[in-house]
Design a protein with these regions (language model features):
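Residue(s) in the substrate-gating loop at a strand-loop-helix junction
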Residues: 140
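Conserved glycine-rich Rossmann-like NAD(P)H-binding loop of the short-chain dehydrogenase/reductase
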Residues: 27-44
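Conserved glycine-rich cofactor-binding loop
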Residues: 13-14
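Substrate-binding pocket helix/loop in short-chain dehydrogenase/reductase
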Residues: 96-97, 101-109, 191, 202
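Conserved small/polar residues in nucleotide/adenosyl-binding loops
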Residues: 213-215
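Alpha-helical segment proximal to the catalytic Tyr-Lys
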Residues: 125, 169-173
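Active-site helix of classical SDR
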Residues: 120, 156, 164
Length: 215
């Protein structure tokens, strides 16, 4: 289905990003999955090899302009231009606003929102040139509903929604689609680290009171 397509997935070492990378790889795509460390990138490459998926893991700090530029340049030299970008990389640093430190705010905005701008812009020219491309960003229901103790995370995820709608209007006529996916509460390594009261608050908003899926 995705033969000859090149996919770039940020934050592919675990959780949602890993599941996306493996699913697209199983569908025939060549997949580049990023990790924040060399060891993480090596682990991605090993998983791809074990699963007989074409592609590799590569180290990337999504907040670093130079690293983003170099990554896309190296991918272009080794594999060609990216057909599908999945902006998945994200972190949490939860705190109530009165106790939130400035670095807790800035780290979330830089990693979860500003990286979307950096990554999307870096691959967009190649997509427009081919008049074909897909940019998919992982946001969250928290971006629409809010959640106490997550003003930073909610602001970043809401920003992704606005960014996505605006960019879609810019490049749709050029053959590039831009969409966002807002998962509910999914059990991953990241959500496992949430305080129990936040898990219960999120679960209370789900009709069955359960997470939708465990990854």
């Amino acid at each position: 289905m995705l033969d000859e397509k090149l996919v770039l997935v940020t934050g592919a070492t675990r959780g949602i990003g890993k599941a996306i990378a493996l699913t697209l790889g199983a569908a025939g795509a060549t997949v580049i999955g990023t990790a924040t460390s060399e060891l993480g990138a090596e682990n991605i490459s090993k998983v791809f090899t074990d699963k007989k998926i074409s592609g590799k893991g590569m180290k990337l700090d999504v907040t670093d302009n130079e690293q983003v530029s170099n990554l896309v340049k190296n991918i272009g030299e080794d594999f060609g231009s990216v057909d599908i970008l999945v902006n998945n990389a994200g972190i949490t640093k939860d705190n109530i606003l009165l106790r939130m430190k400035e670095d807790e705010w800035e780290d979330i905005i830089n990693t979860n929102l500003s990286s979307i701008y950096k990554m999307s812009k870096s691959v967009l020219r190649g997509m427009i040139k081919k008049r074909s491309g897909r940019i998919i960003s992982i946001t969250s229901v928290v971006g629409a509903m809010g959640n106490a103790g997550q003003t930073n995370y909610a602001a970043a995820k809401a920003g992704i929604i606005g960014f996505t709608k605006s960019l879609a209007r810019e490049v749709g006529v050029r053959g590039v689609t831009v969409n966002a996916i807002a998962p509910g509460f999914i059990e991953t390594d990241m959500t496992d680290s949430l305080p129990q009261d936040q898990k219960e608050a999120l679960a209370s908003q789900i009709p069955m009171g359960l997470s939708l899926i465990h990854i």
